[in-house]
Amino acid sequence: MKANFGYITPVPLNMELIDISLSKTQKRTPTVIHPQYNIVKIRMFYMRKVKHAGNEFASRLGTILTDFPRIEDIHPFYGDLINVLYDRDHYKLALGHVNAAKNGIEKVSKEFVKLLKFADSLYRCKQLKRAALGRMASAAKKLGKTLEYLEEVRMHMSRLPSIDLSGRTLLVCGFPNVGKSSFVRKISRADVEVQPYPFTTKSLYVGHFDYKYLQWQVIDTPGILDQPLENRNTIEMLSITALAHIKAVVLYFIDLSETCGYSVEEQMDLFNTLNPLLSSNMVIVLSKSDVLGLSGMEDKKAIMSFLEGKKYMEMSCEKEENIDAVKAMACDLLLDERFERKINSERLSEYINRITIVRPKELREKAESFICSREVTEIENEQERYLIPEEYRYDIVPEIVDGKNVADFFDPDIEKKLKEVEEEEEGLLPMYCKTYDVLSPEERALKEEVVAGIERRRIINRLREKKRLPDSWKHRSRNSGGDIAVHVRRDSKTQVAQPPRLPSKKKARFDDKHYYDRKPKHLYRGRK
């Protein structure tokens, strides 16, 4: 079970609550009404505003009531933690005040909606609406101190550590400045502040680590002083609450060197005081063994009688001695205890008879298959397989040097042989590269003439198939020559000569020249 209070919605202050609710009402309801409207429409207009305002106030206050946890519904550890940090009575009174204001606003909304049903004019409806919103705002304004307190509680609760109360847990406790935070930093990933003065840790810190492929959490608690319960402050009560409610292996730290400022007798007395809160799973850690160990004490009769029958181990965080051993001892102790508790539980006894151990069938060993292989009569000598002269065959020469085969460069006559090969190739070159002329000069001239004739006929056929005139010219009459564009063939591209442009109408008014169209309009008008 893990509680996380970061989901709580921020609590608005009283004036913020009024501004939010009234602005939402103004935005989400109609805003224009006239006296000449029907009285039923006027009543519905103002009833809608009063209802919406009441719902806005009630929903905002209801969110506060549902988000904050009820002490009776959460784990006792968190219930006592809220009591220590925020005072249980003050916390419940604040939520009760918010609930009373919510009920009062809902009552005001219903009351004024009923009065608006009997209003007989626009003026009376408006005054009833103002009275309703005023009473709602007054009820919200009275929540000023309460909402401030709840916002502080919310901000503090969101910073509380997330502790898995049913998980595997190690709990570290003891006097201030005995080395608890240093141990937590060594075995986990928690960034706990470590300082040479006492009461450095003022709240609960949670670190996580892995042991035997399981996830573990270690809780660092503030230092505790040996004094009556009613005299303990809030910081000490955090440790007392954790010891009382969290099922874990308790690591009680004792500083034998007394550099923490407290004697060994005081630390043993504190252990006896906390003994009712400690479980049977407990390990006493003798810290700062690099300063003074158990063997270096002069009078160790009292401490030995105290440690009799208890699990203990010396440890030094400065020199990192026995840190893993202490962690392993505590973790194994908790694993054994959890295993025994599950075995002895009544719930398991109902199903223990149904559990069967299933083992896989043992397979018979396969007989070796008969493999027919050739018998090796002699060991071949790798040296004899190479084509190397007898006098060089058994020399110890590497095969590969600098990525090159040594045998390629081993022949002393290689240059002479290369020269002979090149001369032989030069002698064979004329024989293989000789060209033969098959045609005589007369036959070659005749061939060229035939090829030229074929090409000439191909060009003539292509020009014959080409159209002499465009298709658009075939359907034009001879008397419409003024509209025919003049085509000029130049560089095998057809260019269209545009007719001369006529002057604009504005310029024609000031010109003596007159331009007539090819078809006058008055001849084709149809009626004079």
UniProtKB/Swiss-Prot annotation:
Domain OBG-type G, first and last residues per copy: 168-335
Positions bound to GTP: 174-181, 220-224, 287-290
Classification via InterPro entries: G_OBG, GTP-bd, NOG1_N, NOG1_Rossman_fold_dom, NOG_C, P-loop_NTPase
Subcellular location: Nucleus, Nucleolus
Signal sequence segment: none
Keyword Nucleotide-binding set for record: yes
Compositional bias per record (Basic and acidic residues), positions renumbered to this chain: 509-518
Main subcellular localisation: nucleus
Protein keywords: GTP-binding, Nucleotide-binding, Nucleus, Ribosome biogenesis
Coiled-coil parts of chain: none
Region (Disordered): 470-528
MF-aspect GO terms: GTP binding
Pfam (any one): NOG1_N
Comp. bias (Basic residues): 519-528
GO terms under cellular component: nucleolus
One Gene Ontology term from the biological process aspect of the record: ribosome biogenesis
Family under the similarity heading: Belongs to the TRAFAC class OBG-HflX-like GTPase superfamily. OBG GTPase family. NOG subfamily.
Described function: Involved in the biogenesis of the 60S ribosomal subunit.
Protein name, as recorded: Nucleolar GTP-binding protein 1
Gene that encodes it: NOG1
